[in-house]
Amino acid sequence: MAKKRIIGIMGLGHVGAHVAYSLAVQGIADELVLVDQNTEKVASEVQDLRDAVAYIPHRVTVRSADFTEVGDCDILVNSVGKIELLRGNHNRVTEMDFTIPAVRGFADKIKASGFD
């Protein structure tokens, strides 16, 4: 039996939600692990994806988690950001003022989860 392909997606805004959907529909992952600080958003995305994968020809498991539960993932996609910071400003570096401290806030949790 082949090893289960598990991909974690951190941040379920515009980018993260689309990445999750694309991975599910294309059959790239056997399991998607969704992480976001907004628990209502995570629950909504998990349910939407579970509904969608019911109609595709391959099996994909979708679950929510927090940063401490990503140790079994093969790949982590970091799509954490704050797109609102770009309104009226098309310089993507502006968003780094949010993203750098955010990554520092969860990096140790990811390490502690056993992700390598």
Q: What is each model feature region?
A:
Residues G8-I9, L34:
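Hydrophobic Val/Ile/Leu positions in short beta-strands of Rossmann-like dinucleotide-binding domains
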Residues D30-N38:
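Conserved glycine-rich Rossmann-like NAD(P)H-binding loop of the short-chain dehydrogenase/reductase
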